């Protein structure tokens, strides 16, 4: 039950972040209105229909579904009544010009065994690489993922101190490509690891090795398929927001 406080809140933009912020503010009792310049919600996570076919626009990989579920739970709703997804395994299949196909399974052991069977790298070397990326995640997640960067107090915690103390272990002084070439002998594995730089429009030859945390997130923590496509994330969150009283105004630049 939302405890009303009669205060008003305006959110600019009905992208996923804007919708999420609106849901959180509504749960704090604010009367929330969202203004969006476009005629549709979602921002980058939108959709387009042509000739009877619908295409998801923008993001194509879904990780950390628990952060979406969190908004429903916060609102006292069952996530599965709004939004469903399934686990992808294998996460990817990679097709190369030489005709070879490499499967990226969700599971550290399976991934390493599968890749070792089809490349010149050993299972042990691949496991070692994934363990290094896991270490990067453990040192950086609490700073960049689990807490707000806009609150000064979040910088004065034991976890942040641990991250700073181990700064040299997160690959910040290496490029992604350099770190990946040191880790793998097979150029296909280097290529697979390097491609994660494209997620934020970066180059693996310029980006810090810290971004090698992304393979860990997808391979070990998992990637998922939202039933109904990626746009179902937007649709479900908009429905939740409306159900708890958030007002939307579209085409209002």
Locate the predicted segments by residue.
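Alpha-helix capping and helix-loop boundary segments enriched in small/acidic/polar residues
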Residues: 56-59, 205, 224-228
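N-terminal glycine-rich phosphate/pyrophosphate-binding loop and immediately adjacent elements
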Residues: 2-139
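Rossmann-like flavin
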Residues: 97-206
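Active-site substrate-recognition segment that forms the wall
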Residues: 81, 204-205, 240
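Generic recognition of stable, solvent-exposed alpha-helical segments in well-folded globular domains
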Residues: 14, 20, 67, 110, ...
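Helical element adjacent to the flavin cofactor pocket in flavoenzyme catalytic cores
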Residues: 213-253
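Generic, well-ordered alpha-helical scaffold segments in large soluble proteins
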Residues: 19, 24, 28, 179-183, ...
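Active-site-proximal loop/short-helix segments
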Residues: 206-214
